[in-house]
Amino acid sequence: GLDKSYILEYNFGAGEGLSLFIPNAKGGAGGPIGNDEKAMGYVEDYNYSEQIAQSNHYWGGQLFSGGAIYLGAVAFFLFFVALFLTKDAIRFPVFVLAVLCMLLAAKTGSLNHWFIDHFPMYNKFRDSKMILVVLQVLVPMMAILFLDKLWKEESLQGDKKFHYGVIGGTVLIALILFAFPSVSGSFITAEEVKQFGEYAKQKPEQLGMIDGLKTELIHVREAIYKADAGRTLFFAFAAAILLLLAMNKVNRYLWLGLMGLFVVLDQVNVDLRYLNSDPIEEGSEVLEK
């Protein structure tokens, strides 16, 4: 089979699972920060502008990233709430499967190594993070199941206080992720830490400048993270309000229509980061292929 380090090159690093509902939790797609005009606007010390512009927009654990595997802030919010509030027994195997998918998508951990060593054909996969395809089915499935329960006004797990507690607690988690960026992990990769250390050894007289660059890079990446964490908080809060309306028997066409609108706005807004309206010109590289 393939070498373990080779198999896990594109698996999630620490905290990268947050990118499932915070697209830029680890910077999104790889590439120079200078290509992102908004990100460059976060630079405070312009003495480091050139170096920041050349730094990688992505700081996760994968060898390279073409963009986050984004499931949606609204969809993930509904999924999380559904695990607590639906009475269906299916929520238990769904929860176990979701946790298993996250563990197998991670770069570290003994579970992945056990699967590589013992599970038939598992060591033939180049990117075991593909297991997240299962999560891409589970999240919308549970979200739709939960909305169906609300639409039909079926009973939910627990009383109203429990319902409000789960919804409020989920929004609180989004608030904590926004207010405390360090919860997501480091904003400097292990390779960058190594590079900064080597620069400091080679040019000790420039230690102040090196530390300043490192601090500025962390600041810019924190700002990139917070922009999307704030976005997720907004959608979580909006979804929470709509759930409260649904639970209080407000016109179901209204809350369901608005929920659908927020899902579309949430997804399309992120999709457009990787698409543009530029026409494909005749004779371009894409057409030639």
Per-region residue spans from a language model:
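Contiguous transmembrane helix-bundle modules in multi-pass membrane proteins
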Residues: 86-288
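Periplasmic/ER-lumenal interhelical loops and adjacent helix-loop junctions
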Residues: 1-82, 180-232
